[in-house]
């Protein structure tokens, strides 16, 4: 009888199984699209030449850093809006969405202007001693792609707002449109018109512009739970923006430090030789597929948990968090198993040397097994804390763990203990273990429950 009553009670919970499936499915497809398109872009750039690959790669490191900052701000807006939805305060939720769109857009324009003014510093100082040919390709790519910063920031903000209301299908469809334009444009301009690096950059700008316009137009639909005001008059609400920044700034710092850490680790990997660089690059691409379900469902966790916290119902928070973590574990076991089975064929497609293929195989097996066990607790669990407003604790834990264990132990295990590139991946998993321990302790002590933003 108790179990039956409990099941009946859960029928009144915020998200049914069908609603969770409708939320998660498009998110997985969207993440899959992003990974595939990234790989397609790399192949197309490679056809322009090695100097172009180097130039584009250097600029992309800067762009990823900037995009991550605005993605973090978008998460802040989504959490605030989601908590208001949970409180049934749709007016305040819409105000949060409007403030997010304006703040992100204007901030992105300011960053774009700064990048243009600092272009020479980036090319000559940040990128260090690069050849004139590489610098030429980087200059062209940076000049064009920088103009897309406001558009990708606006798209990310809009996508986060749609996810906050539980509608991930819109962001998936707009992402599909954006990526289709990008890939088609690259194919035409790179292979057809053969205009080199500009042929890679122009479709990126156009696709992001179209995505921003489409998602903004959809957000102006006043019949949606979350929508933005149809006005060009800017009215900033300092109190609402502070709430968004309370999540966005710690999350942005965490993401930025993570990207910086990756760059520092790459510089270490480069000292291990050409085979190590190749094995690391291939392993990174394949490892992304192993954790893809986790990344997608972590976005769903932000939506679900923020609404439950807004409703001040922590019984639902615990229920959905355990349920979504279980789904991540099952999905990642299946994904990793498939990749293990297909790994010989995947590595064959890369045409690697025996030494590089052996190193990549060891890394992928180690990463896959570790990811199935540790990754959800290291990265999906803190997504719930951010959704509950506990972003600062996540930031402190992640940054300290990354600098000491991921970076410090990369040198210790990889360089001084002689494990080379494999040691760098061992250090990364040590970082995961430390994060997981800290986040599990925080789950049980309950301190993350006291950070609700609204």
Question: Language-model features: where?
Answer:
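Interfacial/gating helices of multi-pass transporter permease domains
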Residues: 22, 45-64, 132-137, 197-198, ...
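Helix-terminus/linker motif at the lipid-water interface of multi-pass membrane proteins
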Residues: 32, 36-54, 123-132, 188-195, ...
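N-terminal transmembrane alpha-helices
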Residues: 12-43, 47-48, 64-76, 108-112, ...
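Short runs within selected transmembrane alpha-helices of multi-pass transporters and secretion channels
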Residues: 74, 144-163, 171-182, 200-215, ...
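Small-residue-rich hydrophobic transmembrane alpha-helices
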Residues: 53-113, 152-171, 266, 277-343, ...
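Transmembrane helical elements of multi-pass membrane transporters/channels
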Residues: 22-41, 144, 178, 207-211, ...
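Short alpha-helical transmembrane segments in multi-pass integral membrane proteins
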Residues: 1-27, 81-148, 192-249, 305-371, ...
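Residue-level hotspots within the lipid-embedded alpha helices of multi-pass solute transporters
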Residues: 31-35, 68, 108, 112, ...
């Amino acid at each position: 009888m108790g179990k039956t009553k409990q099941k009946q009670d859960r029928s009144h919970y915020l998200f049914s199984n069908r609603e969770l499936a409708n939320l998660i499915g498009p998110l997985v497809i969207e993440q899959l699209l992003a990974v595939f398109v990234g790989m397609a872009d790399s192949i197309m750039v490679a056809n322009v030449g090695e100097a172009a690959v180097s130039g584009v790669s250097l600029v992309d490191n800067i762009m990823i850093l900037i995009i991550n900052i605005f993605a973090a701000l978008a998460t802040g807006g989504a959490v605030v809006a989601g908590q208001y939805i949970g409180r049934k305060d749709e007016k305040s939720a819409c105000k949060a969405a409007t403030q997010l769109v304006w703040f992100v857009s204007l901030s992105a324009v300011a960053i774009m202007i700064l990048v243009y003014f600092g272009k020479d510093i980036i090319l000559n100082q940040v990128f260090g001693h690069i050849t004139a040919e590489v610098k030429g390709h980087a200059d062209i790519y940076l000049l064009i792609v920088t103009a897309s910063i406001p558009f990708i920031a606006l798209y990310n903000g809009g996508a986060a707002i749609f996810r906050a209301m539980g509608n991930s299908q819109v962001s998936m469809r707009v992402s599909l449109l954006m990526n289709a334009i990008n890939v088609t444009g690259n194919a035409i301009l790179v292979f057809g018109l053969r205009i080199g690096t500009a042929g890679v950059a122009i479709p990126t700008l156009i696709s992001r512009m179209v995505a921003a316009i489409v998602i903004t137009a959809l957000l102006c639909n006043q019949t949606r739970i979350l929508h933005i005001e149809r006005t060009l008059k800017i009215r900033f609400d300092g109190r609402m923006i502070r709430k968004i920044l309370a999540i966005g700034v710690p999350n942005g710092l965490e993401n930025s430090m993570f990207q910086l850490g990756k760059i520092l680790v790459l510089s270490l990997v480069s000292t291990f030789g050409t085979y190590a660089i190749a094995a690391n690059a291939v392993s990174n691409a394949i490892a992304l597929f192993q954790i893809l379900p986790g990344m997608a469902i972590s976005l769903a966790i932000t939506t679900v948990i923020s609404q439950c916290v807004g409703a001040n119902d922590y019984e639902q928070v615990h229920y959905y968090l355990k349920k979504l973590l279980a789904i991540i574990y099952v999905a990642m076991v299946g994904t990793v198993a498939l990749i293990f089975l297909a790994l010989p064929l995947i590595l064959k497609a890369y045409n690697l040397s025996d030494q590089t293929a052996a190193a990549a195989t060891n890394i992928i097996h180690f990463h896959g097994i570790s990811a199935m066990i540790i990754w959800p607790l290291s990265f999906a669990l803190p997504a719930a804390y951010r959704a509950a407003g506990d972003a600062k604790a996540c930031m402190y834990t992640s940054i300290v763990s990354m600098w000491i264990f991921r970076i410090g132990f990369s040198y210790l295990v990889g360089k001084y203990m002689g494990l080379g590139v494999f040691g760098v991946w061992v250090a990364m998993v040590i970082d995961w273990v430390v994060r997981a321990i800290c986040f599990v302790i925080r789950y049980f002590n309950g301190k993350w429950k006291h950070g609700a933003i609204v």
